[in-house]
Each structure stands twice: as structure tokens, then as C-alpha cells.
Amino acid sequence: MKKTTFLIVGKHAVLEALKNPNRNIERVFLTEDTKKKLNRENQNLNLFKKINVFYKSRKELDNLCGRDEIAHQGLVAEVEQLEDITLKEFILQNKKNDVNLIALEEVTDPRNIGSIIRSAASFNLDGLIVKERHFPSESKLMYKSSSGAIEHLNIFKVSNINSTLKYLRDK
């Protein structure tokens, strides 16, 4: 069964998604100027080899991204959602005794969540616990705000934060 896809935008978000072996990229849209800029910056363009790449104008990318008014930086990718791992599975698979997690409750702004994800990844945290009802999992804005860090952090969606924290305390 084919998963649904969504768009992520921005240089860092798209390049990190391309580097993630667990992420399925359907296609990438970029401008000729962006391709030249990536070549000048010595970005590894081998990432684009096994992916459908479509060259578009900035106006076409603006239309593709919709009315979100997010700066796509000439680079957009259509991706599938990552496979979710449950917190219990992660705890069982994890070999180390100390697991460092951050829990968010009632944080719904995609920019704030993206910034928290970026900070959590920079501190090498193992994951982020979020309430599944309040997590904008397919938000272009969240992916862009995380600057691609979301590709390096486990996101655990739970129904009840309090019971999850009690479960973790008892482990």
C-alpha cells in the first residue's frame, strides 16, 4: 500500500531528507539557479541520482508550495512519512540505560516545534514525545523550522503525556 506524500521545502530540510536512508523521496523540484548554487557550494549532488528531479521556475515552485508563504529557497521535495516507532519499541531496542527525551504538551505552533526539534537534535537527545492530536506531522513550516534536524530525531506520538511520563519513570 502506497503511503500518502507531502511537501517539505528549503535547502537544509530537503538535503537532510535526501541523506536519510529511511526517508522515501518521491521527487524533488528545484530551479536551475538552485542547482548552480548547490554546485558552487560543493553540496553532494549525488543525492539526486536515484530520484526524479524536475526543474521548475520560482513562480512554479511558489504555486506548488501554496499560500503558506514559506521561503522554499528554490528546493522542494515530495516525501513519504517516516515509519513511526513506538516509545515502548524504542525503549526495548535501546541498549543504553539512559535515554534522554523531551516531552511537549499543548505546543502546537509548527515554528516553535521545529525550533525545539532543532535544539533537541543539537543536544543529541534520543527523541521527542508529543501528543498525537497536537502534532503537525506533515507541516512544511515545521520541517523548514527544524532545518532538517527532524530527520535525526525520533518522534514518539502518544495519546497521553502524563501516563507516558509515569511509564518512563517506572522503567
Region annotations inferred by a language model:
Residues R23, L92-K171:
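RNA substrate-binding interface of SAM-dependent RNA methyltransferases
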Residues M1-L92:
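N-terminal positively charged helical leader segments and presequences
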